[in-house]
Amino acid sequence: MKIWVDADACPKVIRETLIRAAERTGVECTFVANHLIPLPKRDNIRALQVSSGFDIADNEIVRRTEAGDLVITADIPLADEVISKGGLALNPRGELYTKETIKARLNIRDFMDTMRASGIQTGGPAALSQTERREFANHLDRILAKRTG
C-alpha cells in the first residue's frame, strides 16, 4: 500500500499528520503538487512535482495509483477515479469516499458548479475544524492498521 496526496490544496495540518503516520508505519507517502512541498528527508516520504495545468497532478495520481493504495484528496472526480481503480480515497476533512457515496458527491459537486456558473455565490469551504482533523487522523489510523498491521 502506498499513500498518494493531492498536495496542491492539502492543508498543512493534514500534511503533518500524514508525515507522522508515514514515519510511524514506514508506508510510502508521495505528495504530488505543481509546486515544491517542504518535506522531511525520509526514504518513504517523497515529493513529486508536476507541471502546472488543469488536472495535471490529478492525472499523475490516477496513473500511478494501484488497487489498495490510499489517495488523500478533496477532489471528487479524482476520488471517483481512484475508487474505480480499487484504491481508497480519503478527504482531508475525514470523509472516506466509497463506491456507495461517491456518485452522490459527484452529483452535489455538479449541482454546485451549475449554481456558480449561473452567478450564484456558493462560498468556499469553512476552515478545517478540530473534529475534522481528528476524524481524518482516526480514519487514516484505521486504514493503516488494516493494511500494515
From Swiss-Prot:
InterPro entries: UPF0178. NCBIfam families: PRK00124.1 (NF001095). It holds the Pfam family DUF188. This is UPF0178 protein VC_0881. Coiled coil: none annotated. Belongs to the UPF0178 family. It comes from the Bacteria.
